[in-house]
From Swiss-Prot:
Pfam families assigned to the protein according to its UniProt record, in alphabetical order: Ribosomal_L18p
Gene Ontology MF term list: 5S rRNA binding; structural constituent of ribosome
Annotated transmembrane regions: none
Gene Ontology biological process: translation
Organism: Bordetella pertussis (strain Tohama I / ATCC BAA-589 / NCTC 13251)
Name the record gives this protein: Large ribosomal subunit protein uL18
Amino acid sequence: MDKKVSRLRRAVPTRRKIAQLRVHRLSVFRSNLHIYANIISPEGDRVLVSASTLEAEVRAQLGGAGKGGNATAAALVGKRVAEKAKAAGIELVAFDRSGFRYHGRVKALAEAAREAGLKF
């Protein structure tokens, strides 16, 4: 079993619990170069809000250096996804770390989203 399969297997129980709660899900994906955050509908069929280090606004705030793979960039993405969610009328979400450890970039994104007003 490789790392990706292990991570996806770790994510299954969390996603099952979130599906039972019937709340919006803040899903995080972390690659070596970028971080992505999506808020998914309770039914799980639509992405309502998204933000990533690929967005022009985030890249401009980072200084154009293209450094999307650090905790500072993750915090900007967390703040941005929270702002977009509040504009869409979403305040309560369940945090889906997608099998990634709650450490480093994933933690920075979550804490920034909380500080910007998302509740989870």
